[in-house]
Each structure stands twice: as C-alpha cells, then as structure tokens.
C-alpha cells in the first residue's frame, strides 16, 4: 500500500448539537478507501486530545506513502479568518476558549506542506459558522 487515509467522523458533541451523518459518512468513506487500497486510520467522536494525536500520528506516517487523504465530517467554524474543526469536547463559553479547544486546520496544512512532490488530499465536510460574529 502506498496510500494512507485519516478519516474522522464527529457526531456526538458534548456542548453543541449532535449530527446524524458524520459517523455514517466517515464509515462509508473508510470502507471505500480501504477497498481502493488505502491504509485507513478511522476514528469516530474524537475529543481535542485524541484528534490532535490522530493528526500527528498520520503526519508522522505520511512520509512512507505517496498519497495521503484526510477526511473530516462534523462541525466546523471560522473565527477571525481561522478555520477550525470541532472536537466532541469543544468549549464554547467564549471566543478564546473555543479557539484553544478546537482543532486549527492550519496545523494540518502546515504539516502536509513538508511533503512536497506527494499527493495530499483534504476533504472537509463541515460548516464554517462563526458563533461569535457580530451582525
């Protein structure tokens, strides 16, 4: 196998609404990619610590593969122009706590930028709401 995929589906959130489809979507994508010859790291309902560990482990393994694919389904948000993926334990009391307790997608993008000449695919099935925007 020369293709690696990280699949995360977050549906069961502690402080925001539960989502019906992310678990199903992640399960389907993981199954299809496995059939296509990807080595699949597949996770459901990750808190921030487990999400950061999963992404770090994926990036550390990526050097051994010619193709990497990252798929996330769940809540997302954009605050101050920064895109975040929402872990199941995200803190929403104020903007600063939210930004610290969500996964900054730039961490992933910076990580894959070191793998030049490889194919890296990122699929995000998430909204980009800003719960702190002023209308």
Locations of the language-model features?
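Caspase-like (clan CD) cysteine peptidase catalytic core
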Residues: 2, 46-73, 77-134
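Active-site histidine-acidic residue metal-binding/catalytic motifs
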Residues: 2-15
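Hydrophobic/aromatic beta-strand patches that form the interior of the parallel beta-sheet core
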Residues: 6-8, 41-43, 121-123
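Glycine- and acidic-residue-enriched helix-capping/strand-helix junction motifs
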Residues: 12-27
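A broad detector of the eukaryotic-type serine/threonine protein kinase catalytic domain
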Residues: 12-13, 38, 56, 90
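A generic structural signal for short coil/turn motifs at secondary-structure boundaries
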Residues: 14-18, 41-42, 94-96
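Short beta-strand elements in bilobed, periplasmic/extracellular small-molecule ligand-binding domains
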Residues: 29, 33-43
